[in-house]
Amino acid sequence: MLLDYFSQLPYPIIFCVPEPIFVMVTVVIPARMASSRFPGKPLVPIIGLPMVEHVRRRALMAAGVDQVAVATCDAAIMQAVLAYGGNAVMTKPSHERCTDRVQEAMLQLPGEIVAMVNGDEPLLVPDAITQVITPLLEHHELDVVNLLSPLETEADYFNANIVKAVCDQYGSVIYLTRAPIPFFRYRTSVPVYRQTGIMAFRNSFLSRFSMLAETPLEKTESIDMLRVLEHSIRICGVVANYPTLGVDQPSDIALIENVLGRDPLQRDLLKQTLVSAL
């Protein structure tokens, strides 16, 4: 009936089909040499390749990613990345928070969605990046997504170097802390998560974030995402499909290499990493 009506009109009708919206996704890897617990960490060799280069090559494997860049304030890191054919941008040395370094890097890079992957995540599973960017692509009201990983040992629960996360029943992060939370007054099945260094943001949000003053809890705990929570901005927590293990101190390198040798998925990713095109 409707088509008959249009066919009788004295002038042609042109139906405009909107073009699909392309959203560029950029991965930024913040890395610096001046780690208090592990100086020079990004360039420490793992199976013959600098740690940051493991992370960069794995990030390039993630579905939905358009480009990857390392953000650093150290010429040695920049030269190493460029020598392997990667992209790197220089940032100010004054940044104390990874997120602020990523925001400055994005002033030099295109992209509507920004995934941040810390340079000390050599066991990065590319799917983890896809996990954090997907909610931003599907839910326009979200600005921040953080990948969480279940805590596996009691030692990790009490380790102040591991940031714990608690979420509400809808998956939003309630709080992040170095303290052991939740406190188990009674034995329950409540999961305990650790924050990972894998997050995603809208680039427009990063600009706003950089203009927000550091907050009391952020300074107290030295956790940059507390600035987001203290300004009542929602952080969507996504539980990792695969366990993550970052490098915090020199002794962690042996653990990383052990996992690379015995875990089937990690062995396969290592092969791809070592032979990946630059």
Give the predicted meaning of each segment.
Residues D4-Y5, Y11:
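Intrinsic-disorder-associated, low-complexity terminal segments enriched in Asp/Asn/His/Tyr and depleted
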Residues L9, P20:
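Cationic, low-complexity basic patches in intrinsically disordered or flexible, solvent-exposed regions
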Residues M24-T72:
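N-terminal glycine-rich phosphate-binding loop and ensuing alpha1 helix
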Residues V65, G111, H140-L142, I233:
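Short, high-confidence coil segments that cap the C-terminus of an alpha-helix
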Residues A69, A75-T134:
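Short phosphate-binding loop-to-helix
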Residues V125-T215:
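Conserved core of the sugar-phosphate nucleotidyltransferase
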Residues V190-L278:
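Conserved alpha/beta core of the MobA/IspD/sugar-nucleotide pyrophosphorylase nucleotidyltransferase superfamily
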